[in-house]
Amino acid sequence: RELPAKTPAIVTMGKFSAGHAPNIIPQEAVIEGTIRTFDRDVTALILRRIGEITDATARAFRGSASVEELASAPPLKNDEALTEQMARCAEMLFGEKSVYRLREGGMGSEDFASYTYELPCAYLLLGAGTAQEDARYGKPMHNESVVFNENILPRGSALLAYGAMQWLEDRQ
């Protein structure tokens, strides 16, 4: 109800810490989470509303609360032309079936995103193994059991080198 239905936003409160014993009401609780959007203004709105709701809820119970933004990565914005050029390079090196374009982007949080506001960037994901290849592979990136197929790294290096050569050739 805070955002239009077609405005993508993910708010995850993934950590809640309070007290040390199950039978004692703690003096303090700390909730930590993440906000992921495609738009900096939407992120700012969500953070503001979290602060307002937190404050109102605490006051309703005669308490106090504060919201602190500890770190923030902006939404990633790929340069469309550079991203398409790198996708074509990947197709030339590895075949069309090896390339999957995420037209709508993803909701990942990435420090690299800060660079995308300073210069043209293309953020690429390199597949690093599937469960069909090996039962150890195919877990999500932030899973405690994740294992990557490191044999893919030369392909990633080849793509970056080839993409750089193409970029330089286009500018001669």
What do the predicted segments below correspond to?
Residues 1-172:
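Metal-dependent amide/peptide-bond hydrolase catalytic core
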